[in-house]
Design a protein with these regions (language model features):
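Long, low-hydrophobicity, acidic/polar, solvent-exposed interaction domains
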Residues: 5-178
Length: 178
């Protein structure tokens, strides 16, 4: 799925076959573009239209690795939180393409706190080649999840949607990127 903005930049959005949130009103778009320079992968952030009192929708290229995406999200979350004009009711959302229903869909993450590095407590680690929903136990008080920093954003978002669709109340609001 291609998504473009005014400067003819292209974003390949992640795909899923379900919609978590169908519509978001009063929002500012934030774009994280996939760029290459030689053999290096780079992220280019366009937040020119970000208004702190609105909901923010993050349109992130699915090819970008988490190690590049998460530091930018952390910076933007801090900027929004530190704004004198922020709204207590505004949310942050990741956008993706619902391929089954053929619409743009969203998953909220405003309450989520990203932590970099391996946790010092027991955690469900999700690596680039290993994801098993059955390992998410419903009997744990809290399940903290860690994602491999080399996962593509597209794969990460597919996992997030799958976990969301389990409707577990025990998932921590902290995620580790290791």
């Amino acid at each position: 799925v291609l998504f473009s903005c005014g400067e003819k930049e292209t974003i390949l959005l992640p795909k899923s076959d379900s919609t978590v949130v169908k519509e978001v009103r009063d929002y500012s778009p934030i774009y994280l573009f996939f760029k290459t320079k030689g053999k290096d992968t780079l992220v280019e952030v366009n937040r020119k239209n970000a208004i702190s009192s609105t909901n923010w929708i993050f349109h992130i290229d699915k090819r970008l690795p988490l190690r590049l995406v998460v530091p930018e999200i952390i910076k933007l979350q801090a900027k929004k939180e530190g704004s004198a004009h922020k709204s207590e009711t505004s949310e942050n959302y990741f956008s993706y393409s619902d391929s089954l229903h053929k619409n743009l869909a969203f998953i909220p993450f405003a309450k989520l706190k990203f932590l970099q590095g391996k946790p010092h407590k027991e955690v469900m680690l999700i690596s680039k080649n290993d994801f098993q929903l059955t390992r998410l136990k419903k009997d744990l008080a809290t399940t903290t999840i860690g994602f491999d920093q080399n996962l593509s954003f597209g794969t990460y978002l597919q996992y997030k949607i799958a976990i969301h669709n389990l409707h577990l109340s025990t998932i921590s609001k902290e995620e580790f990127i290791y």
